[in-house]
Structure formats: C-alpha cells, structure tokens
Amino acid sequence: RVSYEHDYESHGVVLGASRDYAKHNTTLSFNVMGSRDLAGRAGEIADAHEKVTVEVLDREGISAAGMGGLEAVSKGGQHVEPRLITLKYTGRGGGKVLGLVGKSVTFDTGGISIKPSGGMEEMKMDMSGGAAVLEALDAIASLDFAIDIIAVLPSTENMPSGTALKPGDIITQLNGKTVEVTNTDAEGRLILADAMVHCAREGADRIVDLATLTGAVLIGLGSTYAGLISNDDDLAGEIIAVGKRTGELVWRLPLHDEYKDLTKGTITDLVNASSQRKAGTIYAGSFLEEFTEGKPWAHLDIAGTAWDT
C-alpha cells in the first residue's frame, strides 16, 4: 500500500499528468504509437529516473525466450515489430514486489478472424493497458514511492496475412502449456499469458494485469465499472477499495471450476476461445489464471472504461 497522506497538491499534479499522458497515447494512431514507440516511451521513463531500468526484446529475443503466444500473434507480416518491454522500479519498499502487466496491442484487426470494418479505427486503443502501466510507473517513480515494481508490456499488432496465425494452430506458451487457437481475435490473452509468466519469473510476488480484453465486459458493465477477476481475496479487496476512493470503479466477477472447464482443450491443454457466447469475460480471466505461476493475481478488463472520456 502507498500512502497519499502528505503533499496532496504535488501528488495530484503528477498523477493527473500521468493519467492525461496515458489517455493521450491511447488516442494516437498506430502509425504514431506502435510497438517501437511504446518501447521508446519506456526508455524515456528509464532515462528520467535513476531507480528505473528497462529491457526490450525484439522478435528474435521473444522467439528465443520461448514466448509462443506473443510470437504467434506477431506473425501477421514482416512489418509487424513486436516488443516485450520490461521495466523495473526499485523503490526499496522492503515488502512484496508488485507486478504490473499491460496488454499493448497497438492495432487489432482481429487477424484472420477479422473484425467488422465499422469502428475498427478505434482498435488503436487496444494498447490502453500498456499505456496505463507505463504512466503509472512514471508517476510512482516521480513521487519516489517506497515500493518495488516489475512492469511488463507485451506489444504487437494483430494483422491478417498469408503468414498470420490461423484458427486451429497450436502454440506453446512460455510456461509450456499448449493452446489451440480457435479464434485469432482472442489474441490478448495469448500475449498476456507469456507476459504474466515472465513477470512472475522476474520476481513479482503479486501480479495485476490491465487489458482491453473482451467486448463482453462492455455488455455487462458498460463504461462505468471495469471487470475484476482475482484468485486472491485480499488483493481483490485492495483494488475494490482503491477504486471506490479514486472513482475508478471495479466489479468483481467469479472464478469457478465450471468456467475453467470451458477453457480446457481436447488435443491441447487449453483453447483460447469458447464456441459459446456466454461468460466471455470470465472465460478470458479463467484462461489467464493458468499463467499466474501460483502468485496472487488480479485481472482488470478495462475494455469498457479505457475508451470512456
């Protein structure tokens, strides 16, 4: 927990500026804010703060690391330039290391399972989770909070092409679990899965991921509440309480074995999308729980709130 009990004015200026910068970056077109640009912004943050370091993997590094989800989603052509961005802030909090993971698909066409053309221009906002994580880290470092953080942004485009990921393809995620890809437009969970495992292996004790993950959360909660799914009551309770204080409201959705059963494959460990339309947000969260590495974890589906101004 971080205290805000002193110097409200300076805290407010920093937090407000970081929020506005995140929202600004979310509205930028892909040709202005692509994966390389996100990596560049991460580098700017690291250069500005001595307690922040950054490491960036390109396509070759992602493949060598065994991040099969991020690698597969990035197969939509040689112009796609994926990045795995890892920042570490060492504030010497002396407590548990917080992991933040932000989905950073800089443009999402849906891939071979292509989206309808109407409204597709808004899919530049599919990197909202990554934008939020980047600017949150910048604010935390600017305020010199006594907390240690690992932030991971899996960044790519989801594009159709002759080389793109196809329905029916089988991939192996970083933790060794196999996934049959039944819908290439359910790509966010594939890249988040690798990023969450990476975050845990880098030393995170607790993980919070932010992602514009499902349209289903918009149907269920609109743009007032973000969806929250968690395997840990204490962590979920902290997030709910902070949301009430700040106006960033969240609504907790359940995890249950019957939902988890829907994610199981017949020829693989998992399938990335269900043939059924029901409980889409919970399905995605249940899929992600397979990649927590046993850590307390919370998933925030911000598909409804990220684009709300």
Regions found by a protein language model. Give the residues of each.
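Phosphate/ribose-phosphate-bearing ligand recognition and processing surfaces
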Residues: 1-52
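A generic structural signal for tightly packed, nonpolar segments enriched in small/aliphatic residues
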Residues: 7, 38-309
